[in-house]
Regions:
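N-terminal signal-anchor/signal peptide hydrophobic helix marking the start
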Residues: 6-12
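Residue-level recognition of pore/gate-forming positions within transmembrane alpha-helices
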Residues: 12, 20, 43-44, 139, ...
């Protein structure tokens, strides 16, 4: 086991290097940088000042020189300084993590509470109205993009019924309701079908047929054997959902102005804040790699 884990960890090194290199390259190919975004449209700022600022930040150096300089800093724990705010990237990033972790935890809990019972119910009521209805709802949930679900929930719960704030009022459970529901609806629609398939596969196995022939009650079969065998699939889905939520909440955090890592990343991308963008890329890469390792 130790050898396998060590082997997988060594395999992660080229993956992380490749991801950071590609993201670094794509940002440079965008055609503008943070200095252009900050001063480019201000006629009062001369080109000499812009060039001097770009040289101060090292943006005038060759691409590979910039990349290896950043990589060297990363290996020593220095992610650099934000081009826009002037603050330490690592400190800023860490300060936003609690909000994203809270949103992720709530979304995973809501996803499990929705997808697992509904998936089991659809499997138990296989080829009946309940099954067809739940599968139809799952299809609709998969088809709707997250931003549309977010706007729909805003319209209903915030604008029409005035039960919840439209935008975040700080890191609180009340402000977390709508972004949590948005993320949970989309993920539950996908995972419900997979839970249904896993449970249905177990229900069709020979040991279930034998248990039914011996007169074992359906509830005992489902709770004692089927769910235990299907738990591997459910736990795998849970692990993958954690990874996708930790790394993929940027749009939802921006819509609801939830002050987390995702919102920080969107602002950094808008302003071409390279050090902050790279921190987010490293975060996403580490999360997905770690989740895949744990799942394996």
């Amino acid at each position: 086991m130790r050898r396998y884990i060590l082997k997988r960890l060594l395999q992660l090194i080229p993956v992380l290097l490749g991801v950071t290199f590609l993201s670094f390259a794509m940002m440079r190919l965008a055609g503008s940088d943070a200095i252009t975004e900050l001063y480019g449209d201000k006629g009062a700022v001369s080109q000499e000042i812009i060039d001097a600022k770009r040289a101060e930040l090292g943006l005038d150096r060759p691409f590979l020189s910039q990349y290896f300089s950043w990589l060297g800093g990363l290996l020593t724990g220095d992610m650099g300084t934000s081009y826009v705010s002037g603050r330490d990237v690592f400190g800023t990033f860490v300060s936003k993590l609690p909000a994203t972790l809270l949103l992720t935890a709530l979304s995973v809990a809501a996803t499990v509470l929705l997808s697992v019972p509904l998936g089991i119910l659809a499997a138990v009521r296989h080829d009946r109205f309940t099954d067809y209805f739940l599968r139809f709802c799952s299809f609709i949930g998969n088809a709707l993009p997250n931003f549309f679900v977010a706007l729909l929930l805003m319209q209903v719960f915030s604008i029409r019924w005035r039960l919840l704030p439209v935008l975040s009022e700080g890191i609180s459970l009340r402000s977390a309701v709508l972004p949590t529901l948005t993320l949970a609806i989309a993920m539950s629609a996908k995972y419900m079908r997979q839970v249904r398939a896993a449970v249905l596969e177990e229900l069709n196995r020979d040991y279930v047929t034998g248990a039914r022939a011996r007169g074992v009650r359906e509830g005992v079969i489902l709770g004692g054997s089927v769910l235990r065998c299907a738990m591997l699939t459910i736990l795998t889905l849970l692990a993958l959902s954690v990874g996708s939520l930790l790394g993929g909440t940027a749009i939802i955090e921006s819509i609801f102005q939830w002050d987390g890592v995702g919102k920080l990343a969107v602002e950094a991308i808008t302003m071409r804040d390279y050090p902050m963008i790279q921190a987010y890329v490293v975060w996403m890469a580490v999360i997905y790699v770690a989740v895949n390792l744990v799942t394996d």
